[in-house]
Each structure stands twice: as structure tokens, then as C-alpha cells.
């Protein structure tokens, strides 16, 4: 675990000043700490309510090593139940998703209702003497904390975790852009799942604020004209923002009002009308007055978003089509990540829009998306190199946007120029990556999460 300055505290101090010990991207000891101190505490995304729309629907999701059944009970309530039988610890549900009124353990036949209640125990009287030996009035272990925001579902393994709303803080302002375009919210398709030989933090950092890589890593996509914003200058003119628990990037849009700018990125008038009903005046001002449109973002620790508007149809140079993607960087080990990628679309959008937007998403992102191939090559290379002995002697410079004395190269935007909460600035910088890793360092410096003994 030791870095150039030695010891965990030295590693974390370097991270906080923007000089990143390269080995943090491939270190088994640090990954063990992440499991005990970060993912045992933070709120982690596990899915969306639209994935289980009907009573009895369920999906099985993980928070690292812990498997949970996310189920909509017969009472319509959504619950998160630890996927482990109370008897001998077998996983109660072994399918990824489905619809069921009961879950039966295949080991000894113990049966649970979809609300977690134990309802069937073979030979209860003969084997246990009835309730005198084992009280049947028990349930599968619920997640210590389970809550939602705009249909997004989160679990925290920490019984003392702050409420989800407090954890998200001002970043909720930006979450609404991705998850609320009408009163009914968004619906999800997916997830696609695939594994990459890369550390989970790299993707989270990239989506949080790396506008600098776009004209270089994705040069071939720029060259074929997929971007409506083809010049590197357009990325530099956009703003990055950081608000409490997350941050992201934006594009600077051409002059115009709110409706005109929404049309520019491809939204039809009927959707714009619904968006105006649910986005606050302040949220609309970021687009209509400030001229910024959200693009990629990350919510700490490992949930990211993409909003883009590629040119996907031949014959019309000005026609673009927006899409939204939600993704989870699920850690498998210090050098492997399971990427879970969902397509998200307004539930009230026209059917033809949903289908076309989905095609745009598949072209750009997902396991075979053009952007995906470019990014993963970089991330795998970084992770592989970070696992060697020389990487423990190297500090990666993540101080873009700062002078040596810590002053910003470009001052933060005034509230009158950027109406969103948090800190925003234009120009290439790594403020968001530093903020994300500083939060990571804070969690790792705390003691291990408490557990029952």
C-alpha cells in the first residue's frame, strides 16, 4: 500500500493535493480497504423502480460481495432483502430477475414471501418442536438502509448512514436532468453487463469531469462527424461543475432561449413542453440563460450518467438525437470492473423517439459502442501499468487547472453566469477528478464500518 511518501496517510495526502500515487488503480490492499471503509458505508446504486413495475417483480443486484433481492411485494412496496437463507446461508434467489410470489431455498426448502417473511419450513414441528425450537415469525435480513430518488434505488450497508437526500445534497439538482423529463420520470432498458480489466475509479473519474480526453481519445468519432460539436474548442468552452456528492461536464450551446436550445440537441416540442413542467425555473436557466447542457456526470462513488446528442441520420446535417445512459462501475477486484449500463428515456416520450434514442445509445455506448472501445483501451492500459513495482514510485499529476501555488488558472463562474449549485468553471481542468478522489480519501481514512458479531 505504501506510495512515494510511505503508508496509507501519505497516499491519501498526495491524493488530496492532486498528485495521485499511480498504484491506487491496482492495489489489492487498497481494494480491501475500499470494501470495508467505502462500500460498507456509502449509498450505492442498485437499480431503478421501472425495472420492477409489477407486484411480484424482482431483480437481484449486488453491493460488491453482498447479493440483494430488490422486489416489489404483493403490497406494491419495493424492498431490498439480503439474498441469504436464514438456515444455512444458501442464496434464496438464483435468477437475475423475474416475477414470483415466493422464494424457496433449494438447499432445504425454506420458503419466503416476496416481502421477505418466512412462510414455509419443512417439518417445522418434527425437526424443531414448532415455535418452541425455532420461531417461524422471521424475515430475510433487510438492507440496513434502502431509499430512492426519482426512481433510482440505493442501498447503504451502514445502519448509521445519513438519509439518501442528505448524502446526495445539491447534486440532486443535476440528477433531475437525467432522471426527470416528465411527471412520470424515466424508464430503463437493460442493464447490459460486461467486464473490463480496469480499476473502477478510472471510469468514475472520466465521467465526472474529463473533457480533456474527448478530442484525442475519440478523434476517430470526431473525424466521421458523429459529434454535432466537432471542435476541441467546444469542450473547452463547456463548464464542469461539482456539487456536494457529484459533478459533471456540460457543452456550451449556441445563442437562443430554452426551447431553441433544447431543439438544438434534438428534443421534440412535445417533450420540451413536459420538461418545462417538471424542471424548476433555476434548472431551466442553466440551459436557457447560461447556455450549458449537461453531458457526462458521476455521483460518488461509482454511479455515472451520459447525456449526448449524436448525428445519427444520413441526409440531414443538422439532425441530432439525444439519449441518456446510466451506468454503474461495479468493482470485482483491484483490477477488474463489471460495467452495468442502462438506457434511460422519458416514460412519456413517443414510441418512435424511444426507439430512435435507443439506437443512438447503442451506437455510442454499451458493450459495443464506439465511445466505449476508445475509453476502455486507455483504462486497461492504466490499470495494467499501475500494478507494477515502478508505479509505486510515480505520482500522477492531476492538478490541471491549478498554478503551483494552488490558485485556479480560470476562476470559478459567478452565480449569474452559472445558475446551478456548487462550483462551476470553464476550460480544461481536473477539479472534479480531484474532488472525487478527495472524497474517496476521506472514506478510506475513517475506521472500518461496524458489523454485528
Language-model features: where?
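Generic structural signal for secondary-structure transition and capping sites
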Residues: 39-43, 90, 212
Amino acid at each position: 500500500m505504501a506510495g512515494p511518501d510511505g503508508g496509507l496517510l501519505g497516499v491519501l495526502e498526495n491524493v488530496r493535493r492532486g498528485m495521485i500515487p499511480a498504484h491506487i488503480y491496482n492495489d489489492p490492499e487498497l481494494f480491501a480497504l475500499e470494501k470495508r471503509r467505502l462500500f460498507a458505508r456509502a449509498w450505492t446504486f442498485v437499480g431503478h423502480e421501472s425495472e420492477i413495475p409489477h407486484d411480484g417483480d424482482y431483480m437481484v443486484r449486488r453491493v460488491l460481495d453482498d447479493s440483494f433481492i430488490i422486489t416489489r411485494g404483493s403490497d406494491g412496496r419495493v424492498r431490498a432483502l439480503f439474498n441469504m437463507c436464514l438456515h444455512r446461508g444458501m442464496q434464496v434467489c438464483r435468477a437475475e430477475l423475474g416475477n414470483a410470489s415466493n422464494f424457496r431455498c433449494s438447499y432445504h426448502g425454506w420458503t419466503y414471501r416476496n416481502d421477505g417473511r418466512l412462510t414455509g419450513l419443512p417439518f417445522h414441528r418434527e425437526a424443531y418442536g414448532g415455535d418452541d425450537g425455532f420461531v417461524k415469525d422471521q424475515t430475510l435480513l433487510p438492507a440496513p438502509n434502502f431509499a430512492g430518488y426519482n426512481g433510482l434505488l440505493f442501498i447503504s450497508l451502514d445502519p448509521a448512514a445519513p438519509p439518501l437526500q442528505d448524502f446526495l445534497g445539491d447534486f440532486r439538482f443535476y440528477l433531475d436532468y437525467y432522471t426527470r423529463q416528465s411527471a412520470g420520470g424515466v424508464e430503463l432498458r437493460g442493464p447490459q453487463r460486461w467486464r473490463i480489466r480496469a480499476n473502477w475509479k478510472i471510469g468514475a473519474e472520466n465521467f465526472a469531469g474529463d473533457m480533456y480526453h474527448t478530442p484525442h481519445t475519440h478523434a476517430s468519432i470526431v473525424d466521421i462527424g458523429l459529434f454535432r460539436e466537432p471542435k476541441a474548442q467546444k469542450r473547452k468552452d463547456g463548464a464542469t461543475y461539482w456539487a456536494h456528492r457529484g459533478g459533471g461536464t456540460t457543452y456550451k450551446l449556441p445563442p437562443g432561449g430554452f426551447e431553441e436550445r433544447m431543439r438544438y440537441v434534438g428534443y421534440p416540442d412535445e417533450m420540451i413542453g413536459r420538461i418545462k413542467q417538471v424542471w424548476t425555473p433555476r434548472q431551466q436557466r442553466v440551459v436557457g440563460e447560461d447556455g450549458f447542457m449537461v453531458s457526462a456526470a458521476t455521483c460518488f462513488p461509482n454511479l455515472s450518467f451520459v447525456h449526448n446528442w449524436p448525428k445519427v441520420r444520413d441526409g440531414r446535417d443538422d439532425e441530432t438525437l439525444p439519449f441518456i445512459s446510466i451506468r454503474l462501475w461495479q468493482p470485482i477486484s483491484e483490477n477488474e470492473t463489471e460495467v452495468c449500463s442502462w438506457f434511460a428515456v422519458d416514460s412519456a416520450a413517443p414510441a418512435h423517439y424511444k426507439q430512435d434514442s435507443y439506437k443512438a445509445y447503442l451506437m455510442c455506448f454499451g458493450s459495443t459502442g464506439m465511445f466505449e472501445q476508445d475509453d476502455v483501451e486507455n483504462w486497461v492500459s492504466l490499470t495494467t501499468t499501475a500494478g507494477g513495482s515502478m508505479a509505486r514510485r510515480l505520482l500522477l499529476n492531476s492538478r490541471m487547472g491549478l498554478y503551483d501555488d494552488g490558485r485556479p488558472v480560470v476562476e470559478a463562474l459567478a452565480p449569474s453566469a452559472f445558475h446551478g449549485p456548487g462550483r462551476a468553471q470553464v476550460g480544461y481542468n481536473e477539479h472534479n477528478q480531484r474532488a472525487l478522489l478527495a472524497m474517496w480519501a476521506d472514506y478510506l481514512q475513517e475506521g472500518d464500518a461496524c458489523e454485528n458479531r
